[in-house]
Each structure stands twice: as structure tokens, then as C-alpha cells.
Amino acid sequence: MAQDGVELEKSVRRLREKFHGKVSPKKAGALMRKFGSDHTGVGRSIVYGVKQKDGQELSNDLDAQDPPEDMKQDQDIQAVATSLLPLTQANLRMFQRAQDDLIPAVDRQFACSSCDHVWWRRVPQRKEVSRCRKCRKRYEPVPNDKMWGLAEFHCPKCRHNFR
């Protein structure tokens, strides 16, 4: 039972990161329960728009509310949390930044050799991949020492830096 709660929490955080924190934790939890942690179904329901009736059901879902105080003091839950602590601590900063909508991003250059197309894209720092718009292949970024086209100009008159 507690393992299901941990998996649900991971799914909720993944969903919120996928939608850049625009989905509230309560709504994400209710949708994950409703669709059985099926990210495709949840994504479709969010994209196509949740019906007004379903929105009222989601806001009234008692399971999506914050856990009661006695649950926070439960020894079984504490034991599971302790056993999963190394995994959680390694990802805690990333999850907190995703929740605060502060996912670190970097500007990277991508190049497609098959269609001779080059583009720049701002991507999350932990997931630096992009898809070519012409041939739809996924590419890793060009290595930092091989990038071209990035420059910075310091204007001596207005003292503004242009990138």
C-alpha cells in the first residue's frame, strides 16, 4: 500500500514536470488515480480539456487532499520513507525545482547531418535532446568545444552586451 503511494507521488511529480508545473498537485494526483498512472491517458485528458463535471469531481476528491497528521506519524510510512531515502535525496532538488518551475535550462546547438539542418534550442539541463523538424530524428547536442555561431558583442557606446 505504501509502495503504491510512493509510485503515485513519482507519477504526479513526473506529470507536473512534463506540464511545467501548470497542473496542481491535487489535480495531478486525482488524474493519476483516475487513469491508473497512465501518463498517456492523463496527458490526453489535460490537452483535450477536462469536462466541467470532471473538474468538480477532481476538486472534491478526498484522496487528493493533504495527508492527515496521524498518517505523517505512522511508523510503517516512516520505515518506507527511510528505505527509499537515498533515491529520494538524489532527486529531491530536481523535484523541488520542477515544483517551483525552476528547472535549469541551457541553450544548446543541435545539428542534423542527414538533412543539413542546424538549430539552437533551450533544453532542460538534465535532458539535452532535440528532434529535427525536417526529418524528425532525435539528436544529442553538439559538444561544447565544437559549437559554432554563438557570440557575444560588447557595445562600447551603450555598454550593452548582445548575445
Swiss-Prot record:
InterPro entries: SHFL
Chief site of localization: cytoplasm
GO molecular function, one term: ribosome binding
Quaternary structure and partners: Interacts with PABPC1. Found in a complex with PABPC1 and LARP1. Interacts with ELAV1, MOV10 and UPF1; the interactions increase in presence of RNA. Binds to ribosomes. Interacts with GSPT1.
PANTHER family documented for this protein: REPRESSOR OF YIELD OF DENV PROTEIN (PTHR16135), SHIFTLESS ANTIVIRAL INHIBITOR OF RIBOSOMAL FRAMESHIFTING PROTEIN (PTHR16135:SF2)
UniProt family annotation: Belongs to the SHFL family.
Name of this protein: Shiftless antiviral inhibitor of ribosomal frameshifting protein homolog
UniProt organism field: Rattus norvegicus (Rat)
High-level lineage: Eukaryota, Metazoa, Chordata, Craniata, Vertebrata
